[in-house]
Structures are given as structure tokens and as C-alpha cells.
Amino acid sequence: MNTGGRLIAGSHNRNEFVLINADDTARIRSAEELSGQTCKICRDEIELTDNGEPFIACNECAFPTCRPCYEYERREGNQACPQCGTRYKRIKGSPRVEGDEEDDDIDDLEHEFYGMDPEHVTEAALYYMRLNTGRGTDEVSHLYSASPGSEVPLLTYCDEDSDMYSDRHALIVPPSTGLGNRVHHVPFTDSFASIHTRPMVPQKDLTVYGYGSVAWKDRMEVWKKQQIEKLQVVKNERVNDGDGDGFIVDELDDPGLPMMDEGRQPLSRKLPIRSSRINPYRMLIFCRLAILGLFFHYRILHPVNDAFGLWLTSVICEIWFAVSWILDQFPKWYPIERETYLDRLSLRYEKEGKPSELAPVDVFVSTVDPLKEPPLITANTVLSILAVDYPVEKVACYVSDDGAAMLTFEALSYTAEFARKWVPFCKKFSIEPRAPEWYFSQKMDYLKHKVDPAFVMERRAMKRDYEEFKVKINALVSVSQKVPEDGWTMQDGTPWPGNNVRDHPGMIQVFLGHSGVCDMDGNELPRLVYVSREKRPGFDHHKKAGAMNSLIRVSAVLSNAPYLLNVDCDHYINNSKAIREAMCFMMDPQSGKKICYVQFPQRFDGIDRHDRYSNRNVVFFDINMKGLDGIQGPIYVGTGCVFRRQALYGFDAPKKKQPPGRTCNCWPKWCCLCCGMRKKKTGKVKDNQRKKPKETSKQIHALEHIEEGLQVTNAENNSETAQLKLEKKFGQSPVLVASTLLLNGGVPSNVNPASLLRESIQVISCGYEEKTEWGKEIGWIYGSVTEDILTGFKMHCHGWRSVYCMPKRAAFKGSAPINLSDRLHQVLRWALGSVEIFLSRHCPIWYGYGGGLKWLERFSYINSVVYPWTSLPLLVYCSLPAICLLTGKFIVPEISNYAGILFLLMFMSIAVTGILEMQWGKIGIDDWWRNEQFWVIGGVSSHLFALFQGLLKVLAGVSTNFTVTSKAADDGEFSELYIFKWTSLLIPPTTLLIINIVGVIVGVSDAINNGYDSWGPLFGRLFFALWVIVHLYPFLKGLLGKQDRVPTIILVWSILLASILTLLWVRVNPFVSKDGPVLEICGLDCLK
């Protein structure tokens, strides 16, 4: 039969045939065919208009679309561009559809109402059926009769049946198409019936399937094969000019294959939690809310008349706990995870043979007291930064020494010297981690995946060099213990400027960088800068926040990188690709422009296996932060965070431009509520926007016009006004002001380094921030010892969003205070900062409305500043069990069956919620339970003290000293865990623990001697008391210490409290019968 060189394949069950191209000329498209622009919907070549130009459907974004797909979208779809959403306008040669303007100025009556070509209709319909599941084929089926000239014999069981005419054929190819690669399946019908046609997948090249009678078995493999073949053709394509000379076309510039190239694909993606895990969790939250409603309905309507005070107190505490749970729960509604593609980042910004286009990064390291923050730990952090897997010319490390200690200065000089050996060793053998202390101390097979024979020898030599380096640092620490009476002097005999910590000038020293110092292999090293800001009496230095703002200004003058990484001195880089992970979000062309910072989770070394004080804080970092990432992003936690410099400067997030003429979003269309008011409203909004532009935009655009030399009216006046406003905002440094306008960062290449150093000294002077917006709207925000929460909150109020990045290998690791006292002091400082924010004008309950802060994100910030106030009801609630056992009263009446079921459902909902959180958060039950225990321990100790200290500081002006958490050196595994340090924070939990234990003894004794009418109340009171004791068990274990011996001070407190409880015991007198006769009067005759 005459098939035109094509293969006919059939299916007996489906009663249809498929026509497949099988000739050699159609196997691979030629380079000339691929060079034309193709439709992104059906992959057909876009036709040319009458004037010879390609057909353009969307005038806003020029998304490649052929005319048939354009006409189908206007008639059957949303009438909008798939890429930008702009409503399609009628183009000459296309029919009019509902919604077109009557006065479109197109004189095209012959095409205004004509029908579409059926073959294109079926292709567009099939594509949109795949995108919009649920549409029936009847919406896109079109009728046309067969042509008598297209006679193809019917192939029946491999035999040609010439007795059947063309109007009875199952396969009909219309002669009007002229396209050999178009196939239409038609069910068997008679000559008088209309025929429904449908093509094969339009974008598929059918020749990739080869010969045979079977269609594809694995679509994915065929699709991959097709993409590889097309990409190979494009790579080998040569485009000739008029003289015949050709040049290789860069495949990255081919508009027909934007997503085929790996380097043009997104650098990251969101991974929502599986619905099988998150949907039951969401349903349970609603169930728990319903159970809470029933619970409070029962509690309020069933008071305890003989213990009304206990009942009322317990109900108030329970209501507060419910509100606190709601504030903590709903920000977890939409948790997500993220995945980065480092290979795509390299393909896009690190092309072979060209300089790296990755953005520069300035890294900030802050330290205060070298006695509490050992210099060896700080040196390891700096070494891990200098050896990071990032272009060396793009990295600058700034170390802020807020204590102006010569010990830190000398330790950095030794660190810079050792870095010349350590950095090339790390990059040569790709070792992890790149902090030498933790690399050499890790217990693992260091030869795994190492193939270089020289590795063992060089590792031994490097370990010996590092041990010598440690000896030098330890010698410095030993010498610094005895401070001379006249203070320290430098090598040239001049006094060290920082001998007086509270009164000294600013100091800047560049150890590495552009000074010509290279590593042992002759390669350039990243810049290393020592900074100690000026301090004078009478100036408020704002502690860590002020030091970080000084680093922002110094780095803006010296390097001005567009991105900043902030780490504490004890948080080293555990993953050398951590900065690249952050750049996958920051430098993403589509989603990166609105990201203000990328927050990494905190991971810790040196914590005991049981983590009795919940130092890892896994519940917060693996559950709460994932939930926030699905809303507007995680909060800033103070370290391990990559910032966008422009966001720290207080600028608003870029607004997404709404394309004009967008289609109405009302659904369904017959229920449109706009009523023609949409355009008017949009016009009013635009007028308001023109009347009230952003002040920062005015300033930036004014200075941009000046730099470009544009001659506009009153240019000089505008430039002076803008300059004055920027100086009022950023300070009197012209270099700093000019650097704020450079979105991509950088400093002029012809600037004298000496002049930059002089400018740097100026911007770290103690009076530079006066009458500026530093600490108010720019940089780290002042007003709280937890400046991290306040700084991230201000950015979110400006419309920015943040991102939570959790790479498989932890990006940063630090040391945590495993000692009980140090841990409680750390929690005290965090809670104190939250109280200060709550009592300030920046409280998220009333600040930031009308900005870009989302409601669920606001809930999370409210919870972060309200949680210290929970300590009051928590302390009272934990005291109630002992009071109930000592007095014989209870907070609930006699429990009925309904009440018993209600209480059981309440406890079950709490337990199941925790189990489901552990499931989608991927944490263990040990971590979850330790977090619950320390919530009680910290709530009745650190949070309580923070609440009173915050009230005294804000209301009475009584200042509290900021205590730096000590970072212990490696003197032995868990050596700090069992050291007992007395602090007043231990008093409240100790008291609660003892009175509840005594209460249990009293209750059991009372029950044994006098008996109970009902054992239910006794079990309820015992369960209540044991609940408190179990939660305080880690605290009790910490008090006992390593030797299981009670310290003397605790013994004294126990005796004092026991005396008080003994008096209560005598007052209660449980051995005396309350209802029966008095034994002293009755005597022994009563026993007869």
C-alpha cells in the first residue's frame, strides 16, 4: 500500500492505526530547521507574518507561541500568556473572541470570525488537556469529513484489504496538511458520520522510536534520548554569514532551548512535606482545637466549690497555655524543605576559561573576651573561612575584637602565618571539615576516598605543623595571664592602643589579601582584616550589634561585597561549600531578588550523648524553622546567616511588577465581581503610587542620573538634596555613601589603599553613628540584647523573605554550654532580649502593620517575644500538685465518664501531635522529650528571672550586665558537664522539685492512714505531681553531679525547705481523724 515511506502500526483492541515516519531524512531535524524559533507549547515552528517577521503572541514578554496555540488559548483557555499572564490582544489574521475590545483598530474583517484549522486545534487541545487534567476531549474535538482522494488501504492482520474505501478507513490523513509527521487517529465510522481526530504527542519526534509495531514503552527514556540528540545537534550547528564563513553558536544563547541547558535551570527548588505526613498533622490540629473547646467548656462549667481559688488559678493557667500553643502551632502549618543544585551554579557563573562571576562575600567573625572565648577556637573558625571552597578573590574575612585584646591580635598574626600552609592542603585534598582542630580530632577513617599516595605523608606533616601552631597559641594565652602594670607594648616598643578596654582608638590591620602575601604554592589568599572599633567613656556602644554595624561600614569601604556572612567565633565552617549553598538562593535570577538572608541551622560539637539540657535544640531548628520557611522565611538566630547588604541598609524589597491588562481572576467567569471597576481601581492605585514614591528610590535614582551624566532640570539641586539625605542616613563618609548605591558591590580599582584605611578608621569612630539611622533602620537594630530577632523582624517588615537552607552536611558547627549553669544563663539572655522587644516600640503585636509582614510570620514573632511571660503561669501550675496533695483539695471535681473521656482525648491529641511532628520533622523521640523537659526547666528559672530583669531595666532603668557564654577548650570529653556552679537561677526549680516530692509523700501517707472515699482524686493528684517531677528530672540529675553527691549549698536549701514543709505538715496533721471521734477524749474504749 502507498504510505509514503511511513510505517503503519495498529492495535486490534483499540481499532485504530498509527502512521509513523520511518525514512532516514526525517530521523533527525536538520540544523537549518532547528535554527528557527519553535513554539514552546506544541514545538512547531512559528510562522512568519506578512511583513516577514516571526509571529509574536505576547507583546510584553514575547513568549514563543505559534498562531494555532495562540488562537486556541484565546478561545478555550484563560486568554492570557502562559509566562507573564498578560491578556492576549487580537492580532491581525486571528478571529475575535469574547472580551476583545470593539475598537482595536485592526482592519481585518475577512479573518475576524473565521474558524481555526482543525489540525492545529487538535494539537493545542491535546497539550492543554495534559496541563489541565479533567477537561474532556469534547471541548477540543472538531468535525470535518474525509477527502475522497486520500485512499489508504486498510491493514488488517498484516494483509492489505483493498475492498474497503477511504471513507471506511480507520486511519485518514487529510491531504490539506502536507505534513508527514502529523498523525490523526480516527475510530472506525461510516461515510456519512463526522470523524473525530486526535494527533500523537505534538512535541515528540516519532523517529526516535525506531522501526516496529510497538509504540514507546518508557516515555522518560525516550524523552531523555530526544533531548540529548537535540542538544548535540545544536552544539554542532554552524551558522554561515554572507561570505560563507561560519562560527559556532553558543547553545546557551539559543532561544529555542532555554530549559534544556542545565545552566539555565533554577538553582534550587522547594520540596513540600509529603501529603501523607502533613495532612494528618493538619487534621489533628483542628481536632485538637475542637477538643480544647470542649475541654474549656467542661472546665468553666464545672467549678470546684470547696477549692474555688485553686480551680480558678488552674483555669487561667490552662487558657494561657492554650493561647501559647496556638501561637506556636500555626506557623508550622506549611513546612517545606529545600534542595540546591551546586552544579548548576557552577555552570551558570563559572564558565571554563573565563573569570568567575560568583558574587563576592564578606565574612564577619565577632569576639569579645579571649579568656571566655579561647583564641584557639577563634583561630580555627578563621582558618575554616580562609579555606572555604569559593574563589579567593571573592572572600574577605573581618574579625571584630570588641575587647581590643592584644592576645587576639597576636593570635590572628599566627593564624595568618599558618593559613599559608593549611589552605593549600585543604584545597589539594578536599578535606572536611577545614577547621584543623576538629579535622584531626574526628574519629573516622581519614584515608577513605583518598587516592593520592602523598596524602598520608603530607597529612602527618600538616598535623605536626598544627601542633606547633597550638603550642604558640597556648604560649600566648599563658603569657597573657600576667598583665604588666604599664600594659602591653608592641614589637617596636609603642604601647598597645587597647590597654584600656573602655577607652582606646579604633584599630584596623590587614593581615592577608592584596598585600602580596601568598600561600606556599604561590596562590593568592583571601583577605583577613582585624578590626577593633573606637571606644570612649560616655558613648553607648550597643554591645554586639554596635560591633557588627562597625564591620558593615568597614567592609563597605574596603571590599563592599554585596553579600555578608555572619558567624560567631566558635562556629566554624563544617561544609566548605556552605557559601555556594547560600548563593544558590541569593543568585537565582528568578527568586533571589527578594531574599534578604539565608539562615543555616545551628549544629554543635561536644554535647553529651543524651543531651540532657537540650543544647541541640533540634525541635526548633528541624520543625519550627521548616514551618516558617513555608511562610515568609525563618527568623535570624544570630550566626550562620548570609545577608544581602542592601537589605541590611534598610531598603524595601523589590516589588513585583504587575503586567498591565491582566485578565480577571474571578472564577468562574460568569460570576465576575469586578463589574468594570477593576481598571478604575488600578488607575487610582497607580496614581497614589505616583504621588507617594519611596524615598529611597528617589535618592538612588537621583544619584544614578548624576553618575550617568544625564542633563535634567534642576539636576544640581536634586543631587545636593539626595546627597544630604543619604549622609543623614548613613553618616558623613562620602566613600560609604557612594558604596551604598552599588547594587553589585565592589570598590574603584584606582583608589589608594591608604586612603581607604583612613576612611575605615573614620567609620568605626565612636561618634560616627550620632544623628544617623544606624541601629534604628540600618544594620543590626539596637534596643535588645537579642539583636538577631529584631534585625530579622525589621527586614521582614520591609517585604523581604528569608530562606532556610539545610544541606546534608551541616554548614556550620559550634560549641554549646553543656554545663547546667552556663546553659541557664544562655537561655536567660535570650529571654531577656525577648522581654525587651516586647516592651519596646518594635513589639510585633503592634509594629509593622501595612508593610510586607505576613500574618503567620507575625504569629511566630509574637510567640518569640511572649514566651518568657509563660513562666508565671508555668511556675504557678507546677506548684499546684504539691498544694493539692498537702491540702487534700484538687483543681477538678469528681471525674465523670464524660470528663474522663475528655481528659483522655486531650492527652492523646498532645501525644499524637508530637508523634506526627517527629515524623515529618525527622527527629527522634529523645530530642522531642528533652525539649519538653527543658521547656519546663527554663520556664521556671531563666524565663522567670528574665521577666523580672526586663521589667526592672525598661521600667526602672536598672541595667543588667551582658554575660558572654564561655566556650571551653578541649580539656576532656564532657569535662564541663559535671561542674557545679551555683547561681540564683537554680532556686525556683529546686524548690518546685522538693515540694512536689514531699507532696507525694504526704499524699500517700494521708491516704494510707485516713483512706479516701474515692481513689480517683488521689491518682489524679499523684499523676499531676509526677508530671512535674519527671519534667524536672534532668535538673535533679544535674544537681547531683558526676559523683551522685548533693552539693553543700543544695543540702542547705533542702534543709531549709524541709523545715518549712514540716511546719505545713504539722498544720495539716494527716494522722488526726477529721470526721470521726477525737482519740484523746474517747480513749481505748473506742477500739472495742
Swiss-Prot record:
Pathway: Glycan metabolism; plant cellulose biosynthesis
Keyword Zinc-finger among UniProt keywords: yes
Keywords of this entry: Acetylation, Cell membrane, Cell wall biogenesis/degradation, Cellulose biosynthesis, Glycoprotein, Glycosyltransferase, Manganese, Membrane, Metal-binding, Transferase, Transmembrane, Transmembrane helix, Zinc, Zinc-finger
PANTHER family: X-BOX TRANSCRIPTION FACTOR-RELATED
GN (gene name): CESA9
Chain sites annotated for binding Mn(2+): 544, 568
GO MF: cellulose synthase (UDP-forming) activity; zinc ion binding
Tissue: Expressed in young plants, stems and flowers.
Positions annotated as zinc finger (RING-type): 39-85
Catalyzed chemical reaction(s): [(1->4)-beta-D-glucosyl](n) + UDP-alpha-D-glucose = [(1->4)-beta-D-glucosyl](n+1) + UDP + H(+)
Cofactor(s) the protein needs: Mn(2+); Zn(2+)
Membrane-traversing stretches: 284-304, 307-327, 872-892, 898-918, 934-954, 984-1004, 1016-1036, 1046-1066
Residues at the catalytic site: 402, 788
Protein location: Cell membrane
Binding locations of Zn(2+) 1: 39, 42, 66, 69
Extracellular side: 305-306, 893-897, 955-983, 1037-1045
Cofactor note text: Binds 2 Zn(2+) ions per subunit.
Residues reported in the UniProt entry to bind Zn(2+) 2: 58, 61, 81, 84
Function per UniProt: Probable catalytic subunit of cellulose synthase terminal complexes ('rosettes'), required for beta-1,4-glucan microfibril crystallization, a major mechanism of the cell wall formation.
Name of the featured protein: Probable cellulose synthase A catalytic subunit 9 [UDP-forming]
Topology within the bilayer: Multi-pass membrane protein
Cytoplasmic topology ranges: 1-283, 328-871, 919-933, 1005-1015, 1067-1088
The species this protein was found in: Arabidopsis thaliana (Mouse-ear cress)
